[in-house]
Structures are given as C-alpha cells and as structure tokens.
Amino acid sequence: MGIDIISLISLHEGEEGIIHSVTGGVGLIGRLASMGLTSGMRVKVVRNIGGPLIVTTNGTRIAIGRGQSQQIAVRRLTAAKEKAALS
C-alpha cells in the first residue's frame, strides 16, 4: 500500500494531513517551524479558496501563502486510513 503524499494546497477544506517534509530554504523552514508547522505535525485545512490557505494545528489557526503551501508535503489522512492505523 502506497503512502498518499501531496502538497498541502491539494487538501480540500475539512481534510487533514500529517506534514511529511518542507521543500525550501532555511528561511521558509524556520518561519514555518516558528508557527508550529514541522514534520510529523497534524494539520487540518479550514479554508482553501483563493488567498492564503488557512489551517489549524494544535488548536491554532495559521494563514499560509499559496506558494508556501505548495512547498509543504503532507500525507493525506482519511477516516478509513485512521481506523486501519488504530487497529
């Protein structure tokens, strides 16, 4: 079974993912880390319709530019995959 790795911007509103990696320079990686967006963190997309992407992680809402969100690779989570992982 393959792992579904996509860019954060590809998630639809209401979908969740686990951050897999960030492609970018030290500045971008540091800026995202300061907002709590690091590898292994779970994020949920709140808004993805033009303008910045709005996500939540650990109860905090974060706005991310569309270009930056394309550089964040996530593993998409679905209810079925979560159930399988728990059993």
Q: Whereabouts are the PLM-identified features?
A:
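SH3-family beta-barrel domains
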Residues: M1-H20, R75, A79-S87
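Generic secondary-structure boundary/loop-capping signal
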Residues: I5-L8, I29, R61, S69-Q71
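C-terminal structural segments of small proteins and small subunits
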Residues: I54-S87
